[in-house]
Design a protein with these regions (language model features):
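Conserved, hydrophobic alpha-helical core segments of structured domains
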Residues: 309-316
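Ferredoxin-type iron-sulfur electron-transfer modules in oxidoreductases and energy-metabolism complexes
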Residues: 279-308, 324-441
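Short coil/turn segments at secondary-structure boundaries
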Residues: 136, 265-268, 396-398, 406, ...
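Intrinsic disorder at enzyme termini
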Residues: 4-31, 407-475
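Predominant activation on well-ordered alpha-helical scaffold segments within soluble catalytic domains
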Residues: 71, 120, 247-250, 315, ...
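Residue-level detector of anion-binding/catalytic polar loops
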Residues: 80, 129, 317, 367, ...
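The feature marks the mature, well-folded catalytic cores of soluble enzymes
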Residues: 1-304
Length: 475
């Protein structure tokens, strides 16, 4: 559940968890160093991200026609295309496909859209077991947690914590000491599930309208298992993932892998264009593609907010964010944490439910500097902050203006009057110098500040007075 109060509580808990802080510092430092190592040439980096931004912007500019082209070419290739306006519709589509084929177990590759849909929980409610096949996702599923990072879901855990968890919940006879041993434990469980699964579910990194091709980027091979071994493959994707041409994929793939994990290229890159053909010996008999909107069309209608949809889900903004790297992903209580989550979640949910996330930023701009597709994250954050209190314009965000507080508006109006009038300003300064330091910390206007910071002390003399006494001002 999203709320400002829960976010504050979870933030305090994270900041007071030394082990979590150490885990994130180690992981984030390593990711930043690896990314820097694969982008040694600043000029090449700027040229590549300019190209990536243009490719994504071009696709968004032509989004309606490209989606129609994607549907037509996928259908011609034998892929069954479905449209879902909401996560409820998307979940029902997956369930209908599963029930039609009497599916009892599902294996899932990495997919942020399926997390957005809360698909595992939904299928479980209808008696269908959904097992995560990505190692990081499997770890947090076994431990009944949510992902804390969009690329590395279990990054908040260290090796010892994962080993102990596997010992307690997966293989009581083994206490693994190395990453290889832990991987072997997971592989032993997952391999059996791959062969038993009735349906595989995957995400989509890029969908090529020109050819009707679905592209999946991965490192572990689980995505390939999920999309080839079960007789039915269901791919779920946000409508913004479409690209115009096959030639658009290589630049974005290069940006994605290097920005995400510091790799020149991932271990596996899957391109799916059709179900199994009659002359082929393996592959799914049916492939379904579910195109999810869930507020994306609303974002697309606004010139600035549309840039949110440029995202290729590399996670670089998170790795460099001074807020995320200190509190982790769970504090956000959202599918998408970090800088991209702060601008995406309020638009997917509503400003009333998630608008507070836009305030959790210092606006330092580190996320903007490392974004491979040049999303103006800080500009969008400021826009969302403004829209929380502005209900006078035609704003394409759910419940805009809902957080406007009358008392806050009155305070800012008074502040403006004081700072616009020299006499009132001097009177305010004089009064604060006399009584300001005696104000109790429990006052409503001070409490939020003093709960985490020292109360500011007011000087007895203003800077103007001191300068005049020193003869620095010629009256």
């Amino acid at each position: 559940m999203l709320s400002p109060e829960k976010f504050q509580r979870d933030t305090f808990a994270a900041l007071n968890n030394p082990q979590l802080r150490r885990n994130f510092k180690r992981a984030m430092s390593g990711l930043m160093e690896k990314r820097q190592a694969v982008f040694p040439d600043a000029e090449e980096w700027q040229q590549l991200r300019e190209l990536g931004s243009l490719i994504r912007a071009n696709a968004l500019r032509k989004l309606p026609e490209l989606l129609e082209q994607l549907e037509a070419n996928c259908t011609a290739n034998g892929i069954q295309v479905h449209w879902a306006e909401t996560v409820d519709e998307a979940n029902k589509l997956v369930l209908e496909i599963a029930q039609r084929h009497k599916v009892k177990s599902v294996v899932k590759g990495k997919s942020m859209v399926s997390e957005e849909m809360e698909l595992n929980h939904f299928l479980g409610q209808h008696g269908i077991e959904a097992l995560e096949a990505d190692l990081g996702e499997y770890i947090i599923q076994v431990d009944h947690e949510l992902p804390s990072h969009i690329i590395m879901p279990a990054i908040h855990k260290n090796k010892e914590q994962i080993s102990q968890m596997f010992h307690e919940k997966v293989d009581p006879e083994t206490l693994a000491e190395s990453a290889e041993e832990m991987t072997a434990i997971a592989r032993k469980v997952l391999r059996k599930k791959f062969y038993e699964a009735d349906m595989g579910v995957s995400g989509v990194n890029f969908a090529v309208a020109e050819t009707g091709t679905l592209c999946l980027v991965e490192n572990e091979g689980n995505g390939r298992f999920c999309t080839t071994l079960p007789p039915v493959h269901v791919a779920v994707m946000g409508i913004e993932k479409v690209l115009q041409r096959l030639d658009d994929v290589p630049p974005l793939l290069s940006l994605l892998t290097r920005s995400a994990t510091g790799q020149a290229i991932t271990t596996y890159f899957n391109m799916i264009t059709s179900p199994r053909k009659s002359v082929e010996k393996d592959g799914p008999l049916e492939v379904h593609l579910i195109l999810l909107d869930n507020g994306r069309s609303r974002m697309h209608s606004d010139e600035l907010l549309r840039d949110t949809l440029l995202c290729i889900r590399c996670g670089a903004c998170m790795n460099h964010c001074p807020v995320y790297t200190r509190i982790g992903g769970h504090a956000y209580s959202a599918t998408y944490p970090g800088p991209i989550g702060k601008i995406l979640t309020p638009q997917i949910k509503s400003l009333h439910e998630a608008g507070h996330l836009a305030d959790a930023s210092s606006l330092c701009g580190a996320c903007v500097e490392v974004c491979p597709v040049k999303i103006p994250i800080t500009d969008i954050l400021l826009r969302l902050r403004h829209d929380k209190a502005d209900n006078k314009r035609n704003i394409p965000i759910t419940e805009s203006g809902v957080l406007k507080a009358k008392i806050e508006s009155l305070i800012w109006k008074c502040w403006g009057m004081v700072y616009a009038n020299p006499i009132l300003y001097q009177l305010k300064s004089y009064k604060l110098s006399k009584v300001g330091n005696y104000m109790p910390e429990w006052l409503p206007l001070l409490r939020n500040w003093t709960s985490v910071r020292s109360k500011p002390r007011f000087a007895k003399k203003s800077l103007h007075q001191l300068a005049r006494e020193e003869g620095l001002i010629d009256e």
